Amino acid sequence: MPVHEIRHPLIRHKLGLMRRADISTKNFRELAQEVGALLTYEATKDLPLEQYEIPGWAGPVTVEKISGKKITVVPILRAGIGMLDGVLSLIPGAKVSAVGVARNEETLEARTYLEKLAPDIAERRSLIIDPMLATGGSMVATIDLLKKAGSKEIRAMVLVAAPEGIEAVRKAHPDVIIYTASIDEKLDENGYIIPGLGDAGDKIFGTKQKEA
């Protein structure tokens, strides 16, 4: 399973700002969107193109457009919503397929409570977005759901990933490609990524924060 850690200077700079314990909700939210957009650039750089002709100012001109399967963006609720605008700024025509997954804070097991998928998801590339890949439970549950719905080409895009989460996805779904801004050190005893970003959902939505 390919894992791409995108170490672009702009991404490294913005991710460093996001790691601050005292970051404001406004700044965290804006940076999540910006890093999401930058990761989207990398995650879509191998999309196929086809040529076509248009009328130009000096006569007909041959240009290119994306061909093949269209894309559906799959935010894992709730934190994935924080990356959505950044992703859609680059692929505004993509359909959005929302998946709600809750993690039991004691067992760390994932439970799916919502799925609103694009009706033609089997004919689309699925791009899952979530700020954190920690234990991997939510990601694996989402991929399970998408494959059951007929999705065959799936990629995952996260801001930070723990080695444990990457390994969980690799074991369950070795065909899924992961793009991340950082592979962090480890998980702590509570399942939080170290050094991580803290609770990304709380920081995006302005609710109670937990530092990790």
From Swiss-Prot:
The family annotation for this protein states: Belongs to the UPRTase family.
Q: Where does uracil bind?
A: I193, G198, D199, A200
Q: Name one GO cellular component term.
A: cytoplasm
Please name the source species.
Pseudomonas aeruginosa (strain ATCC 15692 / DSM 22644 / CIP 104116 / JCM 14847 / LMG 12228 / 1C / PRS 101 / PAO1)
Pathway recorded for this protein: Pyrimidine metabolism; UMP biosynthesis via salvage pathway; UMP from uracil: step 1/1
What cofactor does this chain's UniProt record say it requires?
Mg(2+)
An annotated Gene Ontology molecular function: uracil phosphoribosyltransferase activity
EC category: transferase
Functionally, this protein is described as follows: Catalyzes the conversion of uracil and 5-phospho-alpha-D-ribose 1-diphosphate (PRPP) to UMP and diphosphate.
What's the protein here called?
Answer: Uracil phosphoribosyltransferase
The gene it comes from is: upp
| NCBIfam families assigned | PRK00129.1, upp
This enzyme catalyses: UMP + diphosphate = 5-phospho-alpha-D-ribose 1-diphosphate + uracil
Which branch of life, at top level?
Bacteria
What is the organism lineage in this UniProt record? Bacteria, Pseudomonadati, Pseudomonadota, Gammaproteobacteria, Pseudomonadales
Disulfides per UniProt: none
